[in-house]
Amino acid sequence: MNRLLKLTAIIEAAAGLALMVVPAVVVRLLPGSRLDTSAAVTLGRVAGAALCALGLACWLARDDGQSRAARGLVAAMLLYNVATVAVLAFAGIGFGLHGMALWPAVILHAAMAVWCIACLRRSPQNEMNWFDHKTRGPPSTGFDAH
């Protein structure tokens, strides 16, 4: 899971920075169209900031391994990757858009979604089981009153 989080952090932060700095170039590469209004440029930059935030979250979780927080982040990234595949594929098939990077981006996000699923299917390692089956309750903290 660590490698997935590191690679996701790099990819999404780079895409986010590109959208914030040169949104027209990114839009030209993906759907192959132009950003004609200031509102579209603004929304592109907001999307870039969101991708940077995802990248930062993945980078900060990269050494958490199988923690619940890291697994939750990977589940969120799975949703993001599946939605991105659907939106970009529909842009290509349904709207006939054809930017140079459109289909490579679809393939990349599909592969990342498969990797997310593989990581989530693995049983968590070194994760404390929250429910103690011996006492049928939460694990003891050592500070419980006797």
Predicted regions span which residues?
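Cytosolic juxtamembrane helix and N-cap/initiation of the first transmembrane helix
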Residues: 1-12
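Membrane-helix boundary connector in multi-pass membrane proteins
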Residues: 86-104, 119-121
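Core segments of alpha-helical transmembrane spans in multipass integral membrane proteins
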Residues: 13-20, 39-62, 75-86, 107
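Non-cytosolic membrane-interface motifs at loop->transmembrane helix junctions
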Residues: 33-41, 71-73, 96-107
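Membrane-water interface at the C-terminal end of transmembrane alpha helices
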Residues: 111-130
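Juxtamembrane helix-break-helix junctions at the cytosolic face
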Residues: 58-71, 92-94
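Short, highly charged, low-complexity non-transmembrane loops/tails of multi-pass membrane proteins
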Residues: 126-146
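Interfacial loop at the N-terminal end of multi-pass membrane proteins
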Residues: 23-44, 63-66, 131-133
